[in-house]
Amino acid sequence: MGHQISKEDNGEQSNSNNLKKERRYTTNSSNLHFLYQQEEGIGINYKTGSANNSLSNSTNSNNNNYNNTNSSNNNNNSGNNKKITESTSLEDFKQFSTTLSISSTTPPDTPIISYNNSNNNNNNNNNNKSNKAVHFTRTRSRSLNITNTSRNLKVTSSPIIDSQVCAPNNSYNSSIQSLNSLSSTNSLSINTNTNTSSSLSLSSNSSNNSLSTLTNTTTTTTTTTTTNTTQQQQPIKGRKSKSSNALFKSLRSSLTGSSSSNSNSGKKRSSSISSSTNSLDINSANNNNNNNNSLKVSSKKSSKGGSPNSSTESLQSLSTSASASSLTSTPPLPPKSNAFSKSQNSSASSLNKQVISSLPPLAPTSTLTTTTTNLEVSKESLKPSSTPIDNNSVADSSYNNNNNNNNNNNNNNNNNNNNNNNNNNKNNNNLLDRLTDQLHRDPFFYNTNTAYQEENIIVEEVVVKEEEKSLPPKKLPPPLPPKNFKQTTTTTATTTTTTTTTMNPPSPIIQNVNRNNSSSNNSSRHELLRKSSGILPPQTEPTYPSETSSKRSSVEIKYLEENHKYQIFDRLGSGTFSDVYLCINKENGKQYAMKIIDKSLVTMIAQHTDMKVETEVNILKQSFHPHVIQIIDHFESELYYYIVTELLQGGELLYQLEKNHPSTNENVSNYTEEHARKIIKQVIQAVGFLHSNKIVHRDLKPENILFRDKSLGSILKIIDFGLASYVDHDCNCNNNNDNNNNNNNNNNNNTNGEVIQPSSPPPTKLIDVCGTPEFQAPEMVKRLGYSYPVDIWSTGIILYILLCGHPPFQGKNNMIVMSLIIKGELNFDSSVGWDNVSESAKDLIRKMLNPDPEKRLTAQQVLLHEWITTSSDVNGSPQLGAPLFYKQLRRYNSQRHFEKIGDTLLKSQRFIYMSPEKDYLKRRSIQL
């Protein structure tokens, strides 16, 4: 009975080492699954099996290979029942310790670890089964992961025997703890995979190194205790796996949420043999045949390795938490029994008392309690061992060191608990610290009072706030423009008082307008106008807006209504860079037109042209003429300029003519040359006024000429001075010719040969190409420089349309239109509606549309023309074009309507590019 068997089959070991193929063993009856793969240089795998390569026989036998207890089969009452007998002497108990044998195989760096657990008291029926050994073969690997295993335990009449799984502790997986039954109906399911998990547990409700308690509260209890000790030995060290660091990092990230608060949860277990954990299994077995219930306590204890190789620093303390599983995988508790057998060997009782006295007291309970512990992997255990292991010395010293281990167990557990609690606190707060830091650095949650329930979180919150106090405050852009404006009242040179608003902080002073005045009085006057404008350019380079300028943001309109005295209503019209809205003054209730200009577009164009918003404002302030629109107020925001002008309700020129057709309105008389004469006279008067103030409009067209009211005889006004500019000289060809003649006469009279400079400076013409192609002058199309005559050309095109209903130069695209403009060929045929037009009107058109700008009439000369000065009765003059005029006018208005749609699309897509040969701005039109 005190005999110990250690048997190794060398033939099987050699066969297992040479095995390089994958095998799968499946036993459906016992629900056992085991998959292994052994191949040198690929992975660390563990092969289990009996000496005769029969895995099913070794696992299904009543004498479990993982069982370290002394069991024997005796025939009682029925003859087939099993009975548990324990060793009756201390020597026998000593021999119950696991014997470790190491045999080197080929290649030499691939050792085989054989655990041979035998039965001291063997009967004839169990000799063959007890001699079978369990072999664990380790080969070199990149990584090893063992998944959690599941088991299905069924309660039968057979007793439940404790069993311990002997796994090589130098592997990278955690310790294995099992609760197995000798019943043939009990099933064990083990699955081994690679790169899945590093923990193997036989209970879904328990974690690695768990404490499983299974007791029955009864009146009389007979306790049998068997203590198995793991010998103190040096770790079998191997090469560190390449993916071990990645494995430990993945485990650390996935297991940070667990925490252990019990006293037994702080037990650590190293992956080396020298530092194994202390596991305590208390199993209750019920024998129905003998009416004998015994509480079996098997304690597996080990001491810390004292060798330099075993006393290593841990890589990382990893904690695992038990997860809830299905009810089928939870081992059921054995039924309670009212009576227990008192028949027990005296020697066994005395031995059990000695062992139990060294164990901590256990509270009787009928539930299965689990705790969580830490898994510590040693760096030194992953290195190759330099010294062999003496199995005899390890076996002899294991029992001697058992008492010392028991004495130091409590101290080690306390230290482990403290370390484990600290590690768990760090792991639990690791993610929380990052989230808290990110939360407090978020500007939208800055200085918020967030209530936290845990004390450690409150401490971290205070630390983060103290760090942020040292940092400079963040400047965040407001969701809306600031509301604090500085109201300033300025007075212009014409004694008109306007109220301007500037943003806070103030923008830099506006730049001087690009013009050189010969008169000091004019320059001082314009300088005063620029200072009083209050329109300041943006400081940074603009970018293209995401939305079209025709669709103003509701936020901008709301901001404008809240901070100014104007309330915005419907949109009246749109241009290339601006939109016009109807607005009402909140103070007096008067209606005005508000022009909203996109700052980004204006600033972009201003980099290549002389078009500036402040120039438009200054021109409007300077232009007090009955046929020029009047400015009321102006201000700006972060994104837009705002110009408030008088409201013109009469509509555009050509649309008003189409609306006042006799067929649609009976009260309106026929349209004649007299109507066209009155219209063009008002336009020429306004153009002459602008030219006298050294201003060129550059965008005269029917869309920019509006009636003050809806009556046909209402006065007209010129609008849209966005492209207007100042010029430096008078380009009147007559004046130039007079100056040239005077210079020639002076040169002829000069006998000394001195050159007399002309009285006026040399002309400096504009070169920017702007306006609508149908109304552009030839000198602008040719890019030769232009000045005031371009407005005369545009006025002549308007007069041509007023007399026949369509423009003189039309084409499918802008290139055709420009080529026709350069040719300058005019068609006055009767087929196009010139039958009833007088020759005087045709003569004025020819002179106004002269391709040579020097020979083109000026504004004063147009007003002195015969056709303008001659007045006639409206009813007495012939009707212009009869039905043909209105037909062509209606067609032309429809064409302009579609062109507006194209311009809107063009403006939304920003099809604006620079000419590669010269810095001229061009626009690409969309053909509909």
Swiss-Prot record:
Binding site for ATP: 572-580, 595
Origin superkingdom: Eukaryota
GO MF annotations in UniProt: ATP binding; calcium-dependent protein serine/threonine kinase activity; calcium/calmodulin-dependent protein kinase activity; calmodulin binding; myosin light chain kinase activity
Catalytic activity field: L-seryl-[myosin light chain] + ATP = O-phospho-L-seryl-[myosin light chain] + ADP + H(+); L-threonyl-[myosin light chain] + ATP = O-phospho-L-threonyl-[myosin light chain] + ADP + H(+)
Active site feature: 699
A single GO cellular-component term on record: nucleus
Descriptive protein name: Probable myosin light chain kinase DDB_G0279831
Activity regulation details: Does not have a calmodulin-binding domain.
Record's compositionally biased regions (Polar residues): 383-399
